[in-house]
Curated annotation (Swiss-Prot):
<keyword id="KW-0658">Purine biosynthesis</keyword>
<keyword id="KW-0554">One-carbon metabolism</keyword>
<feature type="binding site">
    <location>
        <position position="230"/>
    </location>
    <ligand>
        <name>NADP(+)</name>
    </ligand>
</feature>
<dbReference type="GO" id="GO:0035999">
    <property type="term" value="P:tetrahydrofolate interconversion"/>
</dbReference>
<dbReference type="GO" id="GO:0004477">
    <property type="term" value="F:methenyltetrahydrofolate cyclohydrolase activity"/>
</dbReference>
<dbReference type="InterPro" id="IPR036291">
    <property type="entry name" value="NAD(P)-bd_dom_sf"/>
</dbReference>
<feature type="binding site">
    <location>
        <position position="189"/>
    </location>
    <ligand>
        <name>NADP(+)</name>
    </ligand>
</feature>
<dbReference type="InterPro" id="IPR020631">
    <property type="entry name" value="THF_DH/CycHdrlase_NAD-bd_dom"/>
</dbReference>
<comment type="pathway">
    <text>One-carbon metabolism; tetrahydrofolate interconversion.</text>
</comment>
<keyword id="KW-0378">Hydrolase</keyword>
<dbReference type="InterPro" id="IPR046346">
    <property type="entry name" value="Aminoacid_DH-like_N_sf"/>
</dbReference>
<dbReference type="InterPro" id="IPR020867">
    <property type="entry name" value="THF_DH/CycHdrlase_CS"/>
</dbReference>
<dbReference type="GO" id="GO:0006164">
    <property type="term" value="P:purine nucleotide biosynthetic process"/>
</dbReference>
<protein>
    <recommendedName>
        <fullName>Bifunctional protein FolD</fullName>
        <ecNumber>1.5.1.5</ecNumber>
        <ecNumber>3.5.4.9</ecNumber>
    </recommendedName>
</protein>
<dbReference type="Pfam" id="PF02882">
    <property type="entry name" value="THF_DHG_CYH_C"/>
</dbReference>
<keyword id="KW-0028">Amino-acid biosynthesis</keyword>
<keyword id="KW-0511">Multifunctional enzyme</keyword>
Length: 285
């Protein structure tokens, strides 16, 4: 069994991004800018935003966080997004999800200018992904693909099972795998007999938010396991959706939690923001 080390790869990517930021600044005098909108006091969301800010600082991005109270109105968030859309110093806009229940999340995501949609959640970018065109891809599944590439794991022709059908992870993960010529199956909360599906899989990508959902008897020998889940166990420890200790014995590759997919998500946010900055710089030449 070999670990898919997202922490090590993300550090490599950060070094490359930092170098390219310097080059961009030297040639155009522009610095990539990321705006984050954080609504409410959710500790997990605040921790994620803080990690993103630190990563921006490490690579030399300009970043700003708009913190808003949980009882904020729809129009107040919309006004902030419009302001960021029109701000030439901002290349990427990130809406930290989930948003409070009174907010129409779909409308908010649709308001973000697609060329600044570094999370890849705008329907325009979702459409480009599903039709195999270049655009912004959600950071977590994009990070998974980069991690597989680093370890020279080719998904072409492989039976891939994606567990979880969210717009943020499951659906874009399936689209990326399909674009790379994998045979893809998506399982979700209504799937009957999950074990039957996972046992037939060469590769399992799980992002369902359920501790120990994937157990040893659900995985065939030599399978590749990508654990996208991140949960807080009763002990306070961060764990994924896979029973790591027991499943690791059976598989050929597996991502640890933490240190697997998580760091790659942030690395791809940096990569997407740099991509946006370069595109904006080209437009202004």
């Amino acid at each position: 069994m070999q670990l898919l080390d997202g922490k090590a790869l993300s550090a490599k990517i950060e070094t490359t991004v930092a170098k390219e930021v310097k080059e961009l600044k030297n040639s155009t005098n522009l610095v990539p800018g990321l705006a984050v909108i954080l609504v409410g006091q959710d500790p997990a969301s605040a921790a994620y935003v803080n990690m993103k800010k630190k990563a921006c600082d490490r690579v030399g991005f300009y970043s700003v966080t708009h913190e808003m109270p949980s009882d904020i109105s729809q129009s107040a968030i919309e006004n902030t997004i419009t302001m960021m859309n029109n701000n030439p110093n901002i290349d990427g806009i990130l809406i930290q999800l989930p948003l409070p229940t009174q907010i129409d999340t779909t409308k908010i995501l649709e308001l973000v200018e697609p060329s600044k949609d570094v999370d890849g959640f705008h329907p325009y970018n979702v459409g480009r992904l599903t039709t195999g065109l270049d655009g912004f891809v959600p950071c977590t599944p994009l990070g998974v693909m980069e991690l597989l590439k680093e370890y020279k794991i080719d998904v072409k022709g492989k039976n891939c099972v994606v567990v979880g059908a969210s717009n943020i992870v499951g659906k874009p993960m399936a689209a990326l795998l399909l674009n790379a010529n994998a045979t893809v199956e998506i399982c979700h909360i209504f799937t009957d007999d999950l074990k039957k599906h996972t046992l037939a899989a060469d590769m399992i990508f799980v992002g369902a938010g359920v501790i120990n959902l994937i157990k040893e008897d659900m995985v065939k020998g030599g399978a590749i396991i990508v654990d996208i889940g991140i949960n807080r166990a009763e002990s306070g420890k961060l764990v994924g959706d896979v029973d790591f200790e027991n499943v690791a014995k059976k598989c050929s590759f597996i991502t640890p939690v933490p240190g697997g997919v998580g760091p790659m998500t942030i690395a791809m946010l940096l990569s997407n923001t740099l991509k946006a900055a370069k595109a904006h710089a080209k437009e202004n030449e």
